[in-house]
From Swiss-Prot:
Xref: InterPro entries: DapB_C, DapB_N, DapB_N_CS, DHDPR_bac, NAD(P)-bd_dom_sf
One cellular component term from this protein's GO annotations in UniProt: cytosol
Native source organism of the sequence: Vibrio campbellii (strain ATCC BAA-1116)
Protein name, per record: 4-hydroxy-tetrahydrodipicolinate reductase
Gene: dapB
Keyword Secreted: no
PROSITE patterns the UniProt entry points to: DAPB (PS01298)
PANTHER family on file: 4-HYDROXY-TETRAHYDRODIPICOLINATE REDUCTASE 1, CHLOROPLASTIC-RELATED, DIHYDRODIPICOLINATE REDUCTASE
Binding site for NAD(+): 8-13, 34, 98-100, 122-125
Free-text function comment from the UniProt entry: Catalyzes the conversion of 4-hydroxy-tetrahydrodipicolinate (HTPA) to tetrahydrodipicolinate.
Catalytic activity: (S)-2,3,4,5-tetrahydrodipicolinate + NAD(+) + H2O = (2S,4S)-4-hydroxy-2,3,4,5-tetrahydrodipicolinate + NADH + H(+); (S)-2,3,4,5-tetrahydrodipicolinate + NADP(+) + H2O = (2S,4S)-4-hydroxy-2,3,4,5-tetrahydrodipicolinate + NADPH + H(+)
Known EC number: 1.17.1.8
Highest taxon in the source lineage: Bacteria
Amino acid sequence: MVRIAIAGAAGRMGRNLVKASHLNPEASVTAGSERPESSLVGVDVGELCGEGKFDVFLTDDLTKEVDNFDVVIDFTAPVSTLANLELCKQHGKSIIIGTTGFSEEERELIDEAAKQVPVVMAPNYSVGVNLVFKLLEKAAKVMGDYCDIEIVEAHHRHKVDAPSGTAIGMGEAIAGAMGNKLSDVAVYAREGITGERTKDEIGFATIRAGDIVGEHTAMFADIGERVEITHKATDRMTFANGAVKAAVWLHSKPAGFYTMTDVLGLNEL
């Protein structure tokens, strides 16, 4: 049984992670944290997600619970995720990172930490999305040289970063399959007189509206035909279930940087 701590357990995603951990027969929720100013500190985490009492109470600092968990699942914000990563380094704990919006310097800190503790980091923990990443690699190898490639993503009005980590992950999968770095070919905004589209660019368009959980489409457009690969999420539990699956998988692994491709064995396809 893997003992799991949920960072940001009172948030929308946090509550789903608590529930997913509780429902997974190989996992147990043994700690949960929230910001010190939250009025929910001290509340039973089971009651937060509607699953009854767990006798596990929301803390304002996971350091207080460090003996009670094996793996942290963190879908919060870069600053708090890096603080929890440091905690894991100091105490030999594993961490699942679902937070997006890291700078290049922050990504380097994560890479360094992975030399000391096991880390899974992914822009999306849905099994379907990670299969899409693999399909995009194959499509890019077949069609990338002669098609225009565009990525469109849509999320709820509360999402604070753009484009989404998943959209960037799609772009990285496509660019990598074509032997490019995404930073060299990405175009994140178009406005005014932009001139004609260049051959190699990968364009991104972002929508923020309503309660959209997450929709992503990669378009390979040629003259006379267009291939679109789309994933639509309708429930955050799909991400939560994938993250808990990753936590169970990671618990037995040595220090290193892993992705959902490793968790799901997609490199074997």
